[in-house]
């Protein structure tokens, strides 16, 4: 008997301890802010965090490749701008040298190439401009004469020859510059194509590295998740086996009502072991219900008697109230008759007083002449 009780106490203590541990774990899950998992899928959140990290790593690698390409493009643009500035500088230098060598003031012409008749329009150099009104005897040039025609023609031919040579030189220089620009453009295009090919290879290698890293991360994450699921499954199986063992060996499945009796407090029961009330308890409850029923019936009879008394008192009060109202109506009628006779007497007295005033006091009525004597002057 002692051994059986000892085993029962041990099982009960173990069950109580297990229940207390489960309650502590549940409180930790609910009340611990850092590890609260109520209503939250921790696995899904971890997956989202991993996906976000992979996406951020891919974006960082893409931004690094884009930054490298941008730097290379900037270098190429700077080279082109520098080449354009050098070419502009050389052209400006050549123009300045041409102006300094070929367009000096000492080499200027006295006539315009586009106005050959300038000599005809001008005056001879030996003509004095001091004489304001020259006469016919001062004529020095007549129609049909052109003393400097041969010189002027030679000068025009020389000017034409010079202009033609200069145009040929400019065309040759423009052709040379165009060839240089085409060569530079071809070199730049080849350099940009090579750079684009290099950047494409870099991007492809970055993409391959990113895909490899993503595949490795997915494999590692899948392995971790599989291990976690396996551990969770094993823990759940152990918990189920322990629960089955506990249910099969505990007092929960027994039909003995004594297992619900509390050992330290006899007036209390164990809710998880309670199998129902005993016949004595049911009889005591029925007896108590019968006592309550009799008390309720006595209370109902007392309320009924009280209601009857209240009704009779109400009826007597209503009868007395009706009698008082009848007396009040009679008194009001007597008062109205007395008030009417008094008002009639007062009206007769007032009429007699008014007749006396009209016939005796107010006999001398003022005429229009009496009223016209007032306000007849400005004073």
UniProtKB/Swiss-Prot annotation:
One of its GO terms (cellular component) is sperm flagellum. Pfam families: RIB43A. Residues 85-111, 161-241, 280-304 form a coiled coil. It is found in: Cytoplasm, Cytoskeleton, Flagellum axoneme. The keyword Cytoplasm applies. Keywords: Cell projection, Cilium, Coiled coil, Cytoplasm, Cytoskeleton, Flagellum. Residues 1-21 are annotated as: Disordered. One of its GO terms (biological process) is flagellated sperm motility. Residues 9-21 have a biased composition (Basic and acidic residues). Microtubule inner protein component of sperm flagellar doublet microtubules. Belongs to the RIB43A family. PANTHER family: RIB43A-LIKE WITH COILED-COILS PROTEIN 1, RIB43A-RELATED. This is RIB43A-like with coiled-coils protein 1. The lineage of its organism: Eukaryota, Metazoa, Chordata, Craniata, Vertebrata.
């Amino acid at each position: 008997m002692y051994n059986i009780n000892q085993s029962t106490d041990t099982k009960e203590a173990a069950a109580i301890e297990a229940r207390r541990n489960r309650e502590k774990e549940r409180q930790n899950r609910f009340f611990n802010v850092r590890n609260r998992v109520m209503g939250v899928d921790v696995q899904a959140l971890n997956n989202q965090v991993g996906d976000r990290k992979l996406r951020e790593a891919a974006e960082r690698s893409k931004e690094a490749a884009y930054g490298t390409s941008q730097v290379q493009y900037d270098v190429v643009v700077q080279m082109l701008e520098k080449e354009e500035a050098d070419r502009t500088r050389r052209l400006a230098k050549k123009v300045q040298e041409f102006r300094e060598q070929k367009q000096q003031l000492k080499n200027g012409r006295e006539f315009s190439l586009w106005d050959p008749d300038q000599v005809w329009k001008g005056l001879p150099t030996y003509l004095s401009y001091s004489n304001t009104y020259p006469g016919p005897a001062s004529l020095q040039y007549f129609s049909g004469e052109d003393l400097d025609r041969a010189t002027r023609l030679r000068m025009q031919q020389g000017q034409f020859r010079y202009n033609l040579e200069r145009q040929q030189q400019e065309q040759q220089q423009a052709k040379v510059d165009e060839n240089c620009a085409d060569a530079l453009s071809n070199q730049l295009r080849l350099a940009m194509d090579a750079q684009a090919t290099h950047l494409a290879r870099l991007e492809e290698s970055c993409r391959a590295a990113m895909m490899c890293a993503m595949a490795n991360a997915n494999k590692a994450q899948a392995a971790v998740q599989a291990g976690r699921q396996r551990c969770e499954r094993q823990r759940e199986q152990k918990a189920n086996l322990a629960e089955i063992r506990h249910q099969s060996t505990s007092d929960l499945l027994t039909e003995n009502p004594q297992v619900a009796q509390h050992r330290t407090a006899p007036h209390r029961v164990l809710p998880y072991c309670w199998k129902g009330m005993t016949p004595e308890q049911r009889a005591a409850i029925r007896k108590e219900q019968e006592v309550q029923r009799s008390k309720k019936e006595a209370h109902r009879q007392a309320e009924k008697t009280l209601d009857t008394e209240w009704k009779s008192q109400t009826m007597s009060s209503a009868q007395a109230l009706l009698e008082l109202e009848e007396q009040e109506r009679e008194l009001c009628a007597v008062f109205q008759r007395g008030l009417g006779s008094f008002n009639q007497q007062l009206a007769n007295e007032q009429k007699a007083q008014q007749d006396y005033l009209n016939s005796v006091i107010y006999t001398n009525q003022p005429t229009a002449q009496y009223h016209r004597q007032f306000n007849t002057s400005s004073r």
